[in-house]
Amino acid sequence: MTDLTKWISADELALITPVDQQWLLGVFERFGGYPELEQVWAVMDEPWRELRCDPEVMDQRIGAYYSHPVWLLNGLFIEQHQQSIENRERFRDWVVKQKPKRVVEFGGGFGGLARMIGDAMPSVEVEVIEPHPHPVAMARAGKTRNVRYQPELSGEYDMIIATDVFEHVPDPLQLVFETANHLRRGGQYLIANCFSPVMRCHLPQLFHFRHSWDHALNVMGLRPAEQVVYGRAFQRQGSLQLAPAHQVEKHSRALWHVTQYLPGRVGRPLTKALLALS
């Protein structure tokens, strides 16, 4: 039988339940170690199907899915996957250049990016907000003095970061609005989404945002700024307004019935032009 300490330290194994250890062991034996990226996506679809999750119904099945050890696998995987590491390094380098004093990674998962930022900027307060924090992730964060997990946002931040978060929630604009109200005026919201069907937990009713996300946030009061890796920075301009953003969402969803069949190089500018007229 494979020894999990080949991939996970004994100290961290002690923080993983025997049931979850057995599940991880099955995955590592199945793939001869860590799966490849596309294989991880496929493995993450398995409990979604087993639990019979419905992307239109946010019930206990969804809660069970996000508590499944597949998310521990995901967290461990991205900590050693070279492309994922390089993406986080580039995000970190951009954050460092902005010189924030208080940063929060919202939906930060395993907290890898937060730890990178904390190590690079030891005088900066870095928080991680994660509804399902794993003890292994919290233990790793505990090794970086200025990084800590918190149950919710509090006060005002110079920067909020959300990578691969909003494609998982039924009303992402509401969540952006609520979180961005903790962003100081002139502060930056770094967002990277994947509104594409690479995994079943990416809600298909949100795929229209592939062409309209920036516009929706702009009318909310978050001005699109520079592109950062596969995401974009948005700067808070003043008071935020949710209703205009939801109106953009309504029109975007209607346009998607047609634009989803067009190449992105056509669908995106067409959507932008039509939304400007609405």
Regions found by a protein language model. Name each.
Residues 1-157, 200-277:
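Conserved N-terminal segment of class I S-adenosyl-L-methionine
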Residues 117, 179-180:
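Class I S-adenosylmethionine-dependent transferase superfamily signal
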Residues 150, 181, 188-189:
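Catalytic core segments in nucleotide and nucleic-acid processing enzymes
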Residues 161:
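A conserved beta-strand element that flanks and buttresses the S-adenosyl-L-methionine
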Residues 165:
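Hydrophobic adenine-recognition pocket in adenosine-nucleotide-binding enzymes
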Residues 169-178:
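A short, conserved alpha-helix within the catalytic core of class I
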Residues 169-170, 183-185:
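Helix-to-beta-strand junctions that scaffold the AdoMet/dcAdoMet cofactor pocket
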Residues 186-194:
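Conserved beta-strand signature within the Rossmann-like core of class I S-adenosyl-L-methionine
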